[in-house]
C-alpha cells in the first residue's frame, strides 16, 4: 500500500501544530507538506519553517498571497459592499478560498494524495476549505483531523502539545482562538463564549480602547477610482500599503472593534469579536461615495446584491458562477464611483466630513432652499396626484366597507 503524501494548511498555531504529529501517527509513514499563505497577518516568518519541520513536516512552502488577496478578493468585496449580516467585513471568510487554492496548487505540484486543514467540526472554515477543494481539485482526498481526533477541547490539545514538545503560543490561561489577515482579525473562545461578558482588554490585538484613544481626531482623505481606493491624503498608494496605513490610523483611534452574534453556515449562532480598522473605514467611505454617484434604483438594489455577495463569501462558494455573475453587475455599478471622501477618526468613531466626485448626481441648485432654487414647485402638484392615484382609488372603494 502506497504511503500518503498530505498537504497541510499550516498556520503554526495550536491546531495545525498538533495536527502534523497526529497525522503522522494516524497515517504511518505519511509525508507531510506544510503550506503557509501570507495574507498580511503578523507572524514570525523565520520561525515557521523550522517549527513545521521540528513538528514532523517533510517540507515547508511559504506563499505570499497579499497582493492577490487585495486585488482579487478584498477590492471585489468592497465594491460589492459585502458586510455579512450588515456588520462583518468578512476578513477570515475572504481569506479561506485563496488559502485553499494555494494549498491545492502546492499539492498538485508536489504530487500529494491528500488535502487537510485545521478547521473545527462546528465552524464555517471547514465548509470554505472543502468546498474550494471540491471546486478546484475534486479528485483529491480530504481529511479533517479536528472532526476525527480524540481531543474535545483546546485545553486537551495544549496538554498534548506539551507532552510531545510541540511549541505553541496558546496556554490554558489564554485560550483565545485568533485568526488574522490584512483585512481584519477574528477573536473567539474563552470567556468570549458568554455573550453577556464584555471582551477583556487582552482579547483585542491591535486596536486602542476608544477611551484611551488620542483626544485629537485624525482626518483622512480617501480617493477612489471606479470603486477602488487609490490614494490616501492625496498620495497615490498600492492597495496593500493603503490598507496597512488605514489599519494603523484606525487602530490608533480605536476604530474597527466589532462584537456580534452571527449565524454560522452549520446552523448555530456564535459570538465573534472582530478588529477591522481599514475595512470599517473603507466600507464607510465607499458607501458614502456611492450615495453621491449612483442613480437611486441602482443604489437601492445594490444593497441586496451586497448581502448576496456577503453570503457567497461567508458560505464558502467563492469559486462559483454566481459570484462571477454578481461581479459583472457590481463592476457596471462602480463605473461612476470615482471621487474623494473626507473622514474623521475619533475615539472609535468614523464621521463623514465631506465628499466630492466628478460624477456627482447631487445638484445644489435643485436641492437648495435659497433663492438659487431651480426646482419646479408647480410640477409637484400633478406628480403627487398621479403618484397617489392608486391608493386614492383603493380608499374610495374600500373605506367604509
UniProtKB/Swiss-Prot annotation:
GO biological process: argininosuccinate metabolic process; L-arginine biosynthetic process; urea cycle
Catalytic activity from the UniProt record: L-citrulline + L-aspartate + ATP = 2-(N(omega)-L-arginino)succinate + AMP + diphosphate + H(+)
Localization annotation: Cytoplasm
Enzyme class: ligase
Matching CDD domains: ASS
SUPFAM superfamilies documented for this protein: Adenine nucleotide alpha hydrolases-like, Argininosuccinate synthetase, C-terminal domain
Gene3D superfamilies: Argininosuccinate synthetase, chain A, domain 2, HUPs, Single helix bin
GO MF annotations in UniProt: argininosuccinate synthase activity; ATP binding
Domain of life: Bacteria
Binding-site list for ATP: 9-17, 118
Enzyme Commission numbers on file: 6.3.4.5
PANTHER family assigned: ARGININOSUCCINATE SYNTHASE (PTHR11587:SF2)
Subunit structure: Homotetramer.
Family, per entry: Belongs to the argininosuccinate synthase family. Type 1 subfamily.
The protein's name in its UniProt record: Argininosuccinate synthase
Organism: Chlorobaculum parvum (strain DSM 263 / NCIMB 8327) (Chlorobium vibrioforme subsp. thiosulfatophilum)
